[in-house]
């Protein structure tokens, strides 16, 4: 049984996590993480590994300079939704282990917000699964974003397009 840590509830049990390949990780972080160190720590010996690191943009949706991005999530449900998405895509693309780290809280422009990595026997499977996992994560995981420009915070109604 895998245990996940998130910023509000100290430990969340996600049963579907047991169905992902051993070594897969899905975590919500309230503090900064170094994506390159996390990738090194995750490591593996698969023939292919595709990864994506997303950072907070420097401008808001209205084009103004962004001071911060605030992210909220639904603890427990968020991890379950991401795990279900990862499991389905891992099967669809015949991929191996997956790594999904996502930040919550208040982030400054340039800070890493998400890391998605996928291993597979072939680069095509790893790349397709990684891209699909990122898109599903952006549109189906219960995260809420609030942009801070100056002293004004604005909740976003949707995610940016590809």
Residue ranges of model-derived segments:
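N-terminal, polar/charged subdomain of small-to-medium soluble alpha/beta proteins
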Residues: 12-113, 119-162
